[in-house]
Design a protein with these regions (language model features):
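Extracellular and organelle-lumenal recognition/adhesion modules and their flexible linkers in secreted
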Residues: 1-157, 170, 175-177, 188-201
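Short mixed-charge
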Residues: 213-219
């Protein structure tokens, strides 16, 4: 990953290391130059259970090829589990929390797009219906978003969810095209579907809810 001099990056991660007593140093390490360009030492009271840890790291210099490192200060051995590691720039497009990378968003803005679709095409269907994108699961705290294996061969974190999509449309003054599943999985990969009336009604209600979330009365 690349960092810019003076920019701040919010780190959030979860650790479970039963019995570990000691400090942790989190650092942005410049692999090309072999040096640390930003770090902070944490003093967790206990890691005997899953614990959320946060820090703000500021880059001392520009660096193109960096790693995030977690250095354990105590000697000895311990089993460590790590989950949900997020290093996010504070300087996002329009200052949005959990917003878009500024340079990418500015390039998109320069194209002056008239609309954007979300979540996409085939990913809406999913490899199977069970694998489809569920927009309600892309809302809220990014850590609680379940994510989904994508039929394109990688896992989607849902980090850019329905809410972020709507915000981005507002920021660029473009129309938002919400693509809904029509109770049909990808016909090329599986072709499963439902024609049960009660199940179809749930699909329709989900679409109505999405429209209401976007343009309905906020009260």
């Amino acid at each position: 990953m690349a960092v810019k001099e003076g920019e701040k990056y919010d780190l959030r991660f979860y650790l479970n290391a039963p019995g570990y007593k000691g400090t942790l140093t989190v650092e942005i390490y410049d692999v090309e130059k072999g040096k640390t360009v930003g770090s902070e030492t944490l003093h967790p009271a206990s890691l005997d259970h899953w614990t959320e840890l946060t820090a703000t790291l500021q880059a001392a210099s520009d660096a193109r090829h960096c790693e995030l490192r977690i250095v354990f200060g105590a000697s000895g051995q311990s089993v460590v589990w790590v989950d949900y590691v997020s290093l996010f720039p504070q300087n996002t497009f329009k200052g949005r929390k959990n917003g878009l990378r500024k340079d990418v968003a500015e390039m998109l803005a320069g194209l002056q797009p008239q609309f954007m679709r979300w979540p996409g095409g085939c990913i809406v269907e999913g490899a199977t219906l069970d694998n489809r994108v569920r927009w309600k699961e892309t809302l809220g705290d990014p850590m609680t978003r379940r994510g989904e294996w994508s039929l394109w061969g990688y896992r989607s974190t849902y980090g850019f969810g329905y809410h972020e999509f709507l915000q981005f449309c507002e920021d660029l003054g473009m129309e938002g095209m919400f693509v809904a599943n029509a109770a049909l999985g990808c016909s090329f990969r599986n072709g499963d579907y439902t024609d049960d009336p009660a199940e179809l009604e749930r699909y329709l209600q989900d679409i109505r809810d999405a429209i209401d979330y976007a343009i309905g009365d906020p009260s």
